[in-house]
């Protein structure tokens, strides 16, 4: 089946898809043309609010825009750049985990809470303690434990940190050095803080060797976790090589063995996604810049069916 542009009426990106109460919800970032010039630190991505979309027929049905669910002006600690977000449910409450810059220009992760998946979400006064960087994915395992995956290089500031501590000088690994990994931390029972210090998400090849910094399939940003037949599928963007890739592990922390490319480079610099099952069918949600004629900060949501082969490998999405 041909891919669908999910919401042509507006520019949105970085979709996080979740199923709540039998309906599929997509939590994207919200692009607009701020007039900022393109730069490698993402200054042209000046998103300032979040919407949520919902539907009960992914490929052909009506998509409802529930409007603004959180605005940067309502977040006490955040100044600008409401980048990626995700939502998880626990005990009838909905927790939106999002990334934004504080008044010192530093990215952190925040929490906002709602009584229903379409919001509105009420933000906490402060970001998650010890949080940094961008691109949160919140994954609820079968035992009810909730994990937050996060991290992004360059504009996402992951190179500013090592062992969860800020560096005096940023470090971007090169060549055969180990790359900068995504991070994962279990959340507290109230989904307000990290329950532990974040751990590196290690991606290895079939021989158990860490993919090096110069491998075009190494992690860059856009962590996503889903579970399929008891295995943990960690997927991610490779950033400057523009792939969506995935790796598979036996537990939420990994290590994860690299398996392959899900999506080849699209029109536009970034590629960011989520993977979700709804009504027995798996889907890949992502974005590209075809409708905006390759204006990289004006992206459009897209969805396509996703399939596995008989060995549980994800088939590339065309």
What are these regions (language model features)?
Residues 1-318:
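Carbohydrate-active catalytic/glycan-binding domains of CAZyme proteins
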